[in-house]
A protein has these predicted regions:
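Mobile genetic element proteins and their domesticated derivatives, centered on retroelements
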Residues: 15, 29, 40-43, 51, ...
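C-terminal, beta-rich DNA-binding module of retroviral/retroelements integrases
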Residues: 288-406
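Basic, flexible linker segments flanking DNA-binding modules
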Residues: 52-150, 156, 227-230, 300-312
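Short, amphipathic alpha-helical "recognition" segments used to contact nucleic acids or chromatin
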Residues: 7-24, 74-83
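Acidic/histidine-rich, metal-coordinating catalytic segments
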Residues: 200-223, 244-246, 251, 300-301
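Charged alpha-helix within mobile-element recombinases
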Residues: 228-313, 354, 358-359
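Mobile-element integrase/transposase regions
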Residues: 114-177, 185, 189-207, 234-235, ...
């Protein structure tokens, strides 16, 4: 039998008694107890030096533990995890450092993980599905703050009084700074535009706004995907960028932020929309000023973000080349051409468009630098058709509405 059997101390004593009997081979005694000769001689030596008491296993605990985590660190770690349930070891470690603990006192990521598991504050995750293939569309990279903003609506939920709460979220792609987190009553253009006017007034203008293809940001049927809201953005010099339909992973960082919001706010809704709006603003401030991000070197977004140098009041009207005919689009989306009404799009209502004459019978319609269609003479009237693909904006030296420099 081996030392792993029950009553190991008694077995060791039995081995000592047999091995010390006259005429008994030490090797035979070791084979009888199914232990190695090295182990047998070790216990014989211990018995000779200390008697029966020496046969008890000594503590394997080190005499000193220079890397042992202090109680203060463990208490603070558990407190932070309890307050921020979905933050992992990397972010918790960064938060400990930001709270004044020295780097020598803060444990490694592996140790933090063990502490969380032993405290019942962590679950072992199973192997996830393989990631989807990333898109290959020409999405802009953000080299600095305000290069690209992402926008979306967080899926709605009901407050405890039964009212619908659907936050509009605007986020800086480079710094992860959450510029806006505000419930809207409906996805109406006027209401959303008012929010953007406030955000533009506070933070300036981005170079690009990236959205999905949903209203009021974009339209799958409108010319160049324009809506009244995105047409206004373009008049401010903001480039429009849209992810492919059905591919939210192209806006992955924004979606992950929505996931955090769902777990930490939506799961326990407030009593009213007004109370929820206050909670959302507190969450936004915490997200920007307290939550470190690995991609930012464990800095918080507020340490990286700065407002844009391109201000809302700096935007000037787009100027078309001198040989273009200019028309003001009516609210209903129509223009007048040689006394006849031609429908373009309600998205362009009250905006100015430029008509480039391609021939006596055809004019290309430009909205800023976007070719939104062509008007073709058809008998005694005019019809509109899509613009030829890959139309390049006409060269002009008089256009004061360049892409924003942020």
């Amino acid at each position: 039998m081996s030392w792993s059997a029950v009553g190991i101390d008694h077995l060791r004593m039995d081995f000592i008694l047999i091995a010390r009997e006259p005429g008994v081979s030490k090797s035979e005694a070791c084979r009888e107890f199914n232990i190695s000769r090295k182990t047998g001689y070790k216990w014989l030596a211990r018995y000779a030096a200390g008697g029966v008491a020496a046969l008890v296993d000594a503590s394997r605990r080190p005499v000193s533990s220079p890397l042992r985590v202090s109680g203060d660190v463990v208490v603070e770690l558990v407190r932070l995890r309890g307050k921020h349930e979905y933050r992992g070891p990397k972010k918790l470690r960064a938060m400990l450092l930001r709270r004044g603990f020295s780097p020598d006192a803060v444990p490694s990521l592996a140790t933090i993980g063990r502490i969380l598991r032993r405290s019942g504050l962590s679950e072992t995750k199973g192997r996830g599905r393989p990631p989807k293939q990333l898109p290959t569309g020409p999405l802009s990279s953000a080299e600095g703050p305000n290069d690209v903003w992402t926008v979306d609506f967080k899926g709605w939920w009901l407050t405890r009084d039964g009212r619908r709460c659907e936050p509009l979220t605007i986020r800086d792609l480079h710094s992860r700074f959450l510029l806006c987190l505000r419930p809207v009553v409906r996805r109406r253009t006027d209401e959303v535009r008012a929010v953007f006017e406030e955000v533009f007034g506070r933070y300036g203008l981005p170079g690009v706004i990236r959205s999905d293809n949903g209203s009021p940001f974009a339209s799958l049927t409108g010319p160049c995907g324009l809506t009244r809201l995105s047409a206004w953005w373009r008049t401010l010099g903001i480039k429009l960028e849209r992810i492919d339909p059905g591919h939210p992973e192209q806006n992955g960082g924004h979606e992950r932020m929505h996931g955090d919001l769902a777990r930490e706010v939506q799961r326990q809704p407030a009593a009213t929309v007004a109370e929820e709006e206050l909670r959302l603003e507190r969450w936004r401030v915490e997200f920007n000023l307290e939550r470190p991000h690995e991609a930012l070197g464990m800095k918080v977004p507020g340490e990286v973000y700065h407002p844009s140098s391109q201000k809302l009041g700096d935007a000037r009207p787009y100027v078309y080349p001198l040989d273009f005919e200019r028309r003001r689009v009516a609210k209903d989306g129509c223009i007048l051409l040689q006394g006849q009404t031609v429908y373009l799009s309600e998205a362009l209502g009250r905006q100015e468009v430029g008509l480039e004459r391609l021939s006596e019978a055809c004019r290309r319609v430009w909205f800023c630098d976007l070719a939104v269609g062509e008007i073709v003479r058809d008998g005694d009237g005019y019809t509109r058709r899509p613009a030829a693909p890959a139309c390049q904006p006409p060269p002009t030296d008089c256009n004061p509405c360049p892409d924003n420099k942020v």
